[in-house]
Regions:
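Conserved glycine-rich Rossmann-like NAD(P)H-binding loop of the short-chain dehydrogenase/reductase
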Residues: 30-47
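Conserved residues in the N-terminal Rossmann fold of short-chain dehydrogenase/reductase
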Residues: 36, 58-59
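Rossmann-fold scaffold of SDR-type NAD(P)-dependent oxidoreductases
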Residues: 13, 82-90
Length: 108
């Protein structure tokens, strides 16, 4: 494979849609092996399946350290290493900063 990211391994969180999906597709097009790290199994599998054999879906909740540790372990086990990380995942909610608790801030 040729391209600017040939034989590189990229993990993209929130890669099941929007900007994360665009990153996954762009890096894949440039030769990267891509880990689609996504909490939504349906959209994550869709993107990884469309990208093909150089892509891997791993169900990942970035708000849970055990989940991100497990995702990283699967990525390294499958591809041998991680070269690039795109922290794209986001959460949505109707909150005001003044009303956030320490638990809310830890989750963010």
């Amino acid at each position: 494979m040729t391209g600017r990211f040939a034989d590189r391994v990229a993990v993209i969180t929130g890669a099941g849609g929007g900007i994360g999906e665009a990153y996954a597709r762009g890096l894949h097009a440039e030769g990267a092996r891509v880990v689609v790290a996504e909490i939504n199994e349906e959209s994550g599998r869709r993107v990884a399946n469309q990208l093909g054999k150089r892509a891997l879906f791993v169900a990942t909740d970035v708000g849970d350290p055990a989940s991100t540790d497990a995702m990283a372990a699967v990525a390294v086990e499958t591809f041998g290493r991680i070269d690039h990380l795109v922290n794209n995942a986001a959460i949505f909610g109707d909150m005001e900063l003044a009303g956030l608790t320490n638990v809310d801030l830890d989750y963010l």
